[in-house]
Each structure stands twice: as C-alpha cells, then as structure tokens.
UniProtKB/Swiss-Prot annotation:
GO terms for molecular function: complement component C3b binding. CFH is one of the most abundant complement components in blood where the liver is the major source of CFH protein in vivo. in addition, CFH is secreted by additional cell types including monocytes, fibroblasts, or endothelial cells. Residues 19-82, 83-143, 144-207, 208-264, 265-322, 325-383, 385-442, 444-505, 507-562, 565-623, 627-685, 688-745, 750-804, 809-866, 868-936, 937-994, 995-1053, 1054-1111, 1114-1172, 1173-1235 form the Sushi domain. Glycans are attached at N775, N1100. SUPFAM superfamilies: Complement control module/SCR domain. This is Complement factor H.
Length: 1236
C-alpha cells in the first residue's frame, strides 16, 4: 500500500507549494517555440512566443503565459494555418485534379492529364504547393503522332497529308483504294488513334474473287469454287420463287452485284364475277392452286376449273362467262324446223335434227336430238357417214349387206394375185365413203424371167414374187457380190427389181508356202495383184526372193510358193579338202576345210551356205611360211583388250571393246592372216538411253544420276534378312535394262537336294538337303579332275551331271551379208555369241540386227535393202510443211518431187489451230508416216457482254461451237446474238445497245389514249385516237422497234355537211356538220310514206343513200336470210309497212351494218352481214411449232378483232417478232407466228 500514499503526498505538495512552470510545452505540429528554454522552471508570468512552421502562417503572435504553474494561451483563437497557393495554371489540351488536399494550400498536389490524342512532354505530370508556391513548370501536352503509311501493293492512299512520308497527327484519316481488278482485304480507312498507333493494320489489295453465292431459295447454275472480277453467274430460284432483280449477278469488289435474291411469288385473292372459288385465303403462294365454280347459267371461259398462282398472276385467268349455244350449222344435216327464234339456246335445250342421204346420227336412227351443253352442241358431229359393204370387185363379197359408221374398218379378202390399193387388206368408212374403195386390183409382181444374174442365180424355186418381197441370190463358185459375199438380197418394187445383182470374179486368199505377204485381205477382185516375199533360205521358181501373182478369170496366175535354196560345190584350191562332200547343200549347211601335203591353210577353216551363197570366202593352201602381223590397228571410239605386243603370229586373235556410250557393229575379233589383219569392227554412238531403273522388291539401288546411256551400270543391294539371287549389276544396252536380280527372304530360300555323285557323308547323299550358297565338289567316275557346283535357291549351278559333255560346236566365221559394211574375218565363234550387222549407207537393215551362233551355224541372217525415197508429202487442212531451208533449196526439192529415206518434215498449223499429235512425218521405204491434223484451238468461257447474258453450260468449247446470248431488258443487237469459237478466241459479239424509245412523236389530229411515259421498251406499242370529226385511216398504234418509232396513225377528216335533201320530207334536228357514223333522221310529211332507210349515216365523209317519200300501200314478205345469221323473232309470212325486224349473228360471228331492217314500200331495208369467225386448228399450230397460250382446245373460234395469244412449243424459239404472238382475228383470217 505504499504507492497510494505517495500519490496523496504529491498532490498536497503541488497545491500548497509549487507556483513556477516547467519548460513551455509544444503546441501543435504547425508551431515552433521561439527562443532558448534551458531552465528547469520558469516563474509565474513568464511568456513564451510561438511562430508558425514553414508553409504555415497566422495573424498576430501566439503567446502562452505561466500562471499557477501552467502555461496558459493568451490568444486561444490564434493558430497556424496552411499557407495558400495561387491557381496552379491550366495547360492547353489537358486538365488537372487535386490529388492531395482539398484546396490550393500548402501541401496540396495537383496531377495533370492530357486530353485524348495528346501526350505529356517530359516525366513530371504534377505540381505541389510548398513554402515558395507551386513547384515545377506547368506540364505541356503535345498532339500524338503516328508513323507514315505506305501504299499497299496494287493500290493507293488518299489523305490530307502534305507530303507522302510525313507523320500523321491524332485523328487524321487515311483512305485506301485498290487498282482495277483488286479489292481491299482490311478496312477502307484507318485513323491515327490516341495511343499513337493506327486504328488497324494497313489493308492489302488482293485480286477480286467471289465465292459461290449462297442464295436463299435458289442456287447457282454450273457453280465454281471461286470467281474472278466481272465473272457472271446465272442462278435459278426454287419452285414458287422468282428473281429479285435479274437472273444473273456479277463478281465485283463489293461482292455479288446485284445481290442474287429469290423472292417468293404471291398472288392476291382472285376476283371472279359470277363464280366462287376455294380455298379462300388472304394471300396465295407461287404454284398454289384454286378450284372455282361458276354460278348457274355461267361457265368457265376455258376447259378446266383450276388456276395456278404464277409470277404473271393467276394462270389461266379464272373467268365465268355466259356461254349460250348459237344456231347450229349441221354438216350433212339440218334441224327439223327453223327454230330461228329460239337462238341463242340455253344449256340443256334440245332440238330435233335429221341427216342427209348416206349420213345418220351416231345412234343410227332416222332423227335424233341436238343438245346444248356447257361445252357446246352434243353430239359434236351430229351426222356420220354410213358405209354399206355389199360387193367387192375381184374379191370375196359378204353373204349379207353390212353397215359401218364413219371411222370403222372392215377386213377384206381379195382373189389370188389381187389386192386393195397400196397393198392393203382393210377398208375404212370415211366422210367420203370407203377408203380405199372396195375394188381389188391386180398385184404388181416380179418374175425370174425379168432378171438375169451374170455368174449368179436366184436360189429360191418360186417363179413370181409379190411387191416388196425380198429374195436371195447366190454367186457361182469363184464369184462374189460387190461387198465380197457369196450371196445377196434383191427386192421386188413397183418398177421392178430393186437393183441388178452383180457377181464379180474373185480369188480367195492363196495358201503361201514358205512365203509371207503384207495384205490382210481374205478375197481379191479380178486383176488384183498380190506381192509376196520368200522366207530366209527360200526362193521362187525364178530364183528370186520376191514375186507377185495376179487374180485372173481362171484364178491366181501362179502358185505363191518358195523353194529351199541350195549351194553347189564351190571351186576350191586343188590342195584343199572339204567335208562333208555332197552334190548340193541346203541353206545352213556348213562346209569345213583342211589342207593336204602339209600345206598351211590361209583363211576361214569353214564356210556356211546362205540364201546369197557361200560365205565367207574359201581359204587357200600355202606352201611357204606364213607371215606374222605388226601391231593391230587402233579402233576409233574403242580399244584393244590384249596386252600390246610388237609382233603377232599367223591366226593370232585380238579382241576389241567399244568405249562407253558406243555400240559395236561387226566382229569384235580380228585375226592375223598371213601378215594381214582382218576387218576392224565399227563403234557407233548409241543415242538411245534407258528410262527409270526398275524397282526391286525388298531391295535398293545405289544412288546414280540419269540419263543412263548405253553401257552404264547400276548396282543393287538387298535389305536385311533378304538374299540376292542373280547379278548385282544391271546394264543399259541399246535403251533397255538387262534383267534385274531378285531379293528373296533369307528364311524362305529353298534348299537343294543332294546327289548320288556327292561323296558319302554318313548317310545316303541324295537324301541330304543343302542350304543356299553351299559349294559342293564331286568327281566323275574315271575322271581325275573335280567338278564344283553351288546351291542357288534350290537349284545347283552348274547342274550336277557326269554325262559326257557334248563337244562344243564352233560356228564358221560370220558371213559377209550383201550390202553390209565389210566384216571379213576368219575367226570362229562359240555357241551363243552374237554379232551386230551394219548396212552400208543408203541401205536399211531388215529383220534382226544381230546374227546368232547356235548349234554350229549362224542364224537370224538379216537383209540390207536399198532405201527408197518418198514423193511429195501429204497436205493437211489448216496446216503447212515448215522448213528451215532456203527458198531456193525448197524449190529444188519441190522440183525433184522426191525425198530421201529417213527425211523428217514437220508441219505447222495456221493461227488458231494446233497439232493434234506429233508434228513430224518420216519417209520410210517410199512411204510417209501418217500426217498429223490441225485442230482448232478450244475456247474458254464466253466473253462478258455488257448489258447482256451469255448462256453457257460448260467451261470449255471446241472449235466451231456457237453460243447465243440474250440482251438485258431494254437492250438489243443489230446483228445475230451469237458468237463462235474460232481458233481459241471467240468472235466479237454484237453490242447490246439500248432499244428503248423516248420522245414520243405527236400528230396533228390524234392524241394518246393513255398517259405518256418517260421511255418505252422495244416492241411496245402506243395507241392513239383521232379527234372529233376525224377517223383513223389504218392502225391506231405506233411501235418502238430498237429505239425507233415505227408507224404513223393517219387521221382523216370524215365529217359530213348538210344531209341530202329529200322531197316531201323534213330532217329532225338538222346540223351543219356531222361526225362520222352520226345519223340524220327523215320524216315524210302529209300522206307520204318513207321508202328506204329513214336515217342516213355519215360514213367517211359521205352520206348513205337517202330515203324517198312517196305514196304506197306496199307490204313485205318474210325477211331474207343472211349467211351465218338469222332474225331474233319468229318468222312471219307477211309484214306491214314500217315493221322492224332484228338480225343476230351466230356465236363468234360479228354483225356489220344495221341490225334492224324495216319494211318500206314492199321491200326490206339494207340487210346486215355476219363477218366470219377465225378458226385456229391444231394442224396449223403444229406445223408452225406453236400452241395457244391460254387454251388447249383443238379448235377455237374467235370473233373479228379478237386477240389470240400464242407461244412456242417446248424446245422451240421465236422466229417471228414478239408482237406477232398476239394475233388479231380480221374477218375470218389470222396471221400465224412461227417458231423453230
């Protein structure tokens, strides 16, 4: 409890004792005590003064006094406040904000930021308020800049820059544009952004292309993956849709223009007066159908009650019309009564009718009813012809009379040798009676006696033949028809036999004995010549190797036979022995020689009999010592194989080899014969090279570089686990590789069976199997030497055999082939050796080029035949023979008219044509090889036609092909709208020029019937009407034809003056001038009656005949009939004066004149006329390849001035102008358009 006691004591001491103050206390952080205060205490009343820290200020002094041991503030309200700063200052293109503090006073900090597109210069972006004001300078904002922009390749730039390589400031814009045929890949313009970089990368100018357009409810025709600029694509819309603007679109830099769209076809509900339809919808889509029904008394204008919604509206137009039946004209019949007052008749109304003699109604009654139906009168043909069959001239007549209706047929039987007309056996009842008539006429026949076949005969036994009968004729043995057959056919026709049969002399292909012929014919005509050639070693009877036979009347002129040639014993040296000795020797026989009395033989030790005799030359026997030879000669392009010596003995042989790429012709061995060397071979360059190295399964070839020339070799190797069978190297020999080896899997190699000739190995040798590559030696009985054999994939090489080997037969020295290069040698050759033969210049080798030593004699002996030149080369269309020789040389060659064997000529084609194959022909043994052809270059896509559409279906067109094009609406051509592919280029198309017409012409006395338009399409017509008192003289229309107005309406003044004066008559409402067809009425005065028409009519400026007023009591009889018309009232026998009767025409006939006639003075006034209707028949339309556009009846009746619309049948196009397909019926005649 010591601590509490100390506190109490301290308090008491403070109250009672202390009055001084300690050191003045610190007041605030903003104030600093002035002076030095080092004492421990300070007396009562001492004052301490404070001043403000830097950055602060106050009004007056801040003083504290020591009172009662405490420091007390004398002015408590006085404090140090932060020193203020002025406005920090604005910077252009920037702003600032207080980052520290709430006002501009000591310690405040403002931070500047630049506006977008501007950046601050320097690193200091702030100012602080300190004791001396604002620190730092006001920051500066400068505009942001972007690097210069370079023009894109195939493009250019547009900007407001003064210089092309200057920097751009913030906000500046650069626009890009590509050259023609290119489009931008990237933005069209870029701007310098606030970050100092461009808003996007510089675009590229890429070649304009478009992908196949994707068309909603449509598709492109013949689409491709991509299209180039200005390429055009045609497209078609799906069913129920139509083109938005046009049926094609063009690839542009903006894409497909115009955009290909397919708009749905819609139709509004149809308006059908006097009819109803279903289904009833507010809107119909394309191909939607409606079915309509007409009210009672009305009928569809055309057959059928369906209409379809199309782009042209409802087709056909649904209409209900009143269709009564007019007075019927019955062909070959009449109505029982006049009934004139009952027409036109109502539907279902019936009338009794009867038919003329030989005609009956379809019911075959004597009379029947004609009924008015919605489709017209029924039956359609009221009267049909009735044919009676009761007699057949020259034929079998029926037992009883038989009746047939028009259209029915009957089969008849004529007597033998007779027939109906045209060899028919049926008659048909027609409107004119029987066809053909019932009369059998004698049938035309052909007789054997009417024909004589030289060297042939008719094979059938029949003597006479009916019309159109075919029969066979045969030729005698040794004769054939013109086409080489033994028989032919002839036909009996109206004028006799079809043709004179011919049997010509022929010879069958002969049997050749030891001869060959090039012809493949199986038969030959009279005087035909057949050349043949004997095989080697044979000759014909004349001792020649070639011959010919001729086909004559008695067959071939000779037998094509060749006989084996023979050689006789030649004249020899008297000391020369020959064996074997025979009288004659056959081709191939060998004669060997030896000398007697120890003489030395000089030359070949053997000769062979050939088709040209013995060869080589026979040897001689010499007494003296034979001479040796000096060094053998050098071989051009070759070398000797032996080591060089100074001297070579008689009969010593030296071998040669040709350098690489050279081929040896002749013997590769020469021999020293009595001091002279035999003939050297020749090394000629082999131009033929070998193709690709053959593939080796499971093997590889060591790298080598083509081309591979004659003599080049390549090496093969097998892969691991495979073993090579055969030589490692293959060699190129005359353009062909030698046989390559095989690589066989090592574990699949076959083993070789042992042989009894092998030494014993503990068990029977022939039961032992040996692996591949095993080498075995064996010894034949009675022989001291050992033989060796190796196992090669299951076969011993050489074959294990102890049979006595046949002595190898040597061939005599090779022959000297006639017309071949000198190859004289005396060296014998072993079996299998070959020698290549080289013919002399201007000679050509025939058959094999090499002779082969086989079985001790030379075989495959060729011939050297003389080269035959050729005459003038063949000419080709659109091509000529090109030649590098001078004009003089070409003229000399042309004058000679002969080209040497082997001559090569090349052809060149005219411009626009190319060679179809090799352009070179070669003269070979008097004949030229087949010449090439010059074919027209094909063309690519047809060219673009401005304001037109080219119809193309493929990407490539052959020479001469033609393509048509259509000009856009409002455009046309002055010539044919087609182009042709000519030598790789299209002919120039006709321009599609505007065919619209403007500036409608004006006429003095005529005005337009409709409002005038800005322009009119070609083919469009404009109608005019004449002013009052004028009448149109001709057509009232003019037509726009290819931008020109054609036609002129001519208005003629057809008014009339005062009507003619009539005695005893007055004129009602008389005027001084009357319009055409205006009437003036007369009235008789007093007791006078009017005779004639009471009215006169102004017609084309002239009044009709006026009436007369005279006294009469005359009455009229029945009104006279008119063609194709009748009166509307019941017919009476007597009519009082002044009685009016009305006339009406039949359906589709038009009434001309006054329909009312008046009885005056016992006579009827002028009768009207019924103008004939137009009948449109199916036959006429078929000939013109047209059809009705809206109707499908076989016959349509149209009134005068009615318009009939036609269209082309499917697959045909218009041949006449478009306006002709809207024809007008004019008084029974209509002009038909044509399609083709």
């Amino acid at each position: 409890m010591r601590f509490p006691a100390k506190i109490v004591w301290l308090v008491l001491w403070t109250v009672c004792v202390a009055e001084d103050c300690k050191e003045p206390p610190p007041r605030k952080e903003t104030e600093i005590l002035s002076g030095s205060w080092t004492e421990q205490t300070y007396q009562e009343g001492t004052q301490a003064t404070y001043k403000c820290r830097p950055g602060y200020r106050t009004l007056g002094s801040i003083v504290m006094m020591c009172r009662g041991g405490k420091w007390v503030s004398l002015h408590p309200s006085r404090i140090c406040r932060k020193k203020p700063c002025a406005h920090p200052g604005d910077t252009p293109f920037g702003s600032f904000h207080l980052a520290e503090g709430t006002q501009f006073e000591y310690g405040a900090k403002v931070v500047y930021t630049c506006d977008e597109g501007y950046q601050m210069v320097g690193e200091m972006n702030f100012r602080e308020c300190d004791t001396n004001g604002w620190t730092n300078d006001i920051p500066i904002c400068e505009v942001v800049k972007c690097l210069p922009v370079t023009e894109p390749e195939n493009g250019k730039i547009f900007s407001d820059a003064l210089e092309p390589d200057q920097e751009y400031t913030y906000g500046q814009v650069v626009q890009f544009e590509c050259n023609s045929g290119y489009m931008l890949d990237g933005p069209k313009q870029i701007h310098c952004s606030a970050g100092g970089v461009w808003s996007a990368e510089t675009p590229k100018c890429v070649e304009i292309f478009c992908k196949t357009p994707v068309i909603l409810n449509g598709q492109a025709v013949l689409p491709k993956a991509t299209y180039k600029a200005n390429e055009r694509v045609q497209y078609r819309c799906a069913a129920g849709f139509e083109y938005g603007q046009r049926g094609d679109t063009i690839c542009t830099k903006s894409g497909w223009t115009p955009a290909p769209t397919c708009i749905e076809i819609t139709c509004d509900p149809p308006r059908i007066p006097n009819g109803v339809y279903r289904p009833e919808l507010s809107k119909y889509r394309g191909q939607d159908k409606i079915t309509y029904e007409c009210k009672k008394g009305f009928f569809p204008e055309i057959r059928g009650t369906d209409a379809t919604c199309t782009r042209d509206g409802w087709v056909p137009v649904p209409r209900c019309a009143w269709k009564p039946c007019s007075y019927p004209v019955i062909k070959h019949g009449r109505l029982y009564y006049s009934y004139r007052g009952y027409f036109p008749a109502r539907v279902n109304q019936q009338f009794v009718y009867s038919c003329d003699h030989h005609f009956v109604p379809p019911s075959q009654r004597s009379w029947d009813h004609l009924t008015c139906t919605a489709e017209g009168w029924s039956p359609e043909e009221p009267c049909l012809r009735q044919c009676i069959f009761n007699y057949l001239e020259n034929g079998h007549t029926p037992y009883r009379e038989e009746k047939y209706l028009q259209g029915e047929t009957v089969r008849v039987r004529c007597y033998e040798g007779y027939s109906l007309q045209n060899d028919q056996n049926t008659m048909t009842c027609t409107e004119s009676g029987w066809s053909p008539p019932p009369r059998c006429i004698r049938v035309k026949t052909c007789s054997k006696s009417n024909i004589r076949i030289e060297n042939g005969f008719l094979s059938e036994s029949t003597f006479t033949y009916p019309l159109n009968k075919q029969t066979e004729y045969k030729c005698k043995p040794g004769y054939v028809t013109a086409d080489g057959k033994t028989s032919g056919l002839i036909t009996c026709l109206k004028n006799g036999w079809s043709a004179q049969p011919v049997c010509i002399k022929s010879c069958d292909r002969p049997v050749f004995e030891k001869a060959r012929v090039k012809s493949d014919g199986t038969w030959f005509r009279l005087n035909d010549r057949l050349d043949y050639e004997c095989v080697d070693g044979y000759e014909n009877r004349d001792g020649r190797t070639t011959g010919s036979i001729v086909c004559g009347q008695d067959g071939w002129s000779d037998k094509a036979a060749c006989y084996e040639r023979e050689c006789s014993i030649p004249e020899m040296d008297p000391y020369l022995n020959a064996y074997p000795r025979k009288e004659t020797y056959k081709v191939g026989d060998v004669l060997k020689f030896s000398c007697s009395q120890g003489r030395i033989m000089v030359g070949a030790d053997s000769v062979q009999c050939y088709h040209f005799g013995w060869s080589p030359k026979l040897p001689t026997c010499k007494v003296k010592k034979v001479k040796s030879c000096a060094l053998p000669p050098e071989l051009p392009n070759g070398k000797r194989k032996e080591i060089h010596k100074e001297e070579y003995a008689h009969n010593e042989v030296v071998e040669y080899a040709c350098n690489p790429r050279f081929l040896m012709k002749g013997s590769h061995k020469i021999q020293c014969v009595d001091g002279e060397w035999t003939a050297l071979p020749v090394c000629i360059e082999e131009e033929r090279t070998c193709g690709n190295i053959p593939d080796l399964d499971h093997g590889d070839v060591k790298p080598s570089v083509p081309p591979y020339h004659h003599g080049d070799s390549v090496e093969f190797s097998c892969r691991e686990a495979f073993t090579m069978i055969g030589p490692r190297f293959i060699t190129c020999i005359s353009g062909e590789w030698t046989q390559p080896p095989q690589c066989i899997a090592t574990d699949e190699l076959r083993k070789c069976k042992g042989s009894t000739l092998f030494p014993p190995e503990g068990r029977q040798a022939h039961k032992i199997e040996y692996d591949h590559n095993t080498n075995k030696s064996y010894q034949c009985r009675g022989k001291s030497e050992h033989k060796h054999s190796i196992c090669i994939n299951g076969e011993w090489d050489p074959k294990v055999d102890c049979n006595e080997e046949a002595k190898i037969q040597l061939c005599p020295p090779p022959p000297q082939v006639p017309n071949a290069c000198d190859m004289t040698t005396t060296v014998n050759y072993q079996d299998g050796e070959k020698i290549s033969i080289l013919c002399k210049e201007n000679y050509l080798i025939q058959d094999a080029e090499e002779i082969v030593c086989k079985d001790g004699r030379w075989q495959s002996i060729p011939r050297c035949i003389e080269k035959i030149g050729c005459s003038q080369p063949p000419q080709i269309d659109h091509g000529t023979i090109s030649s590098s020789s001078s004009a003089e040389e070409r003229r000399e060659i042309h004058e000679q008219r002969l080209y040497a064997h082997g001559t090569k000529l090349s052809y060149t084609c005219e411009e626009g044509f190319e060679i179809s194959e090799n352009n070179v022909i070669i003269c070979h043994m008097g004949k030229w090889s087949s010449p090439p052809q010059c074919v027209g270059l094909p063309c690519g896509l047809p060219p673009y036609v401005q304001n037109g559409v080219v119809s193309h279906k493929k990407d490539r067109y052959q020479y001469g092909e033609e393509v048509t094009y259509d000009c856009d609406e409002g455009f046309g051509t002055d010539g044919p709208a087609s182009i042709r592919c000519l030598g790789g280029e299209w002919s120039r198309p006709q321009d599609c020029i505007s065919t619209n017409c403007v500036n409608l012409p004006t006429f003095e006395d005529a005005v337009l019937t409709d409002r005038e338009k800005d322009f009119y399409r070609s083919g469009e017509q404009v109608a005019f009407k004449c002013l009052s008192y004028y009448q149109l003289d001709g057509s009232n229309t003019i037509q726009c034809i290819k931008s020109k107005w054609i036609g002129r309406p001519a208005c003629r003044d057809v008014s009339c003056g005062n009507p003619p004066q009539v005695e005893n008559a007055i004129i009602h409402n008389q005027k001084s001038k009357y319009q055409s067809e205006e009437r003036a009425r007369y009235e008789c005065i007093g007791n006078y009656d009017l005779f004639g028409e009471m009215e006169v009519v102004c017609l084309n400026g002239t009044w009709t005949e006026p009436p007369q007023c005279k006294d009469s009591q005359g009455k009229c009889g029945p009104p006279p009939p008119i063609d194709n018309g009748d009166i509307t009232s019941l017919l009476q026998s007597v009519y009082p004066p002044g009685m009016i009767v009305e006339y009406r025409c039949q359906a589709y006939y038009e009434l001309r004149g006054n329909k009312n006639v008046v009885c005056r003075n016992g006579e009827w006034s002028q009768l009207p006329k019924c103008l004939e209707a137009c009948v449109i028949s199916e036959e006429t339309m078929r000939k013109h390849h047209i059809q009705l556009r809206w109707k499908h009846d076989k016959k349509i009746y149209s009134k005068t001035e009615d318009t009939i619309e036609f269209m082309c049948q499917h697959g045909y196009r218009q041949l006449t102008p478009k306006h002709t397909f809207r024809a007008t019926c004019r008084e029974g005649k209509v002009v038909y358009p044509r399609c083709g």
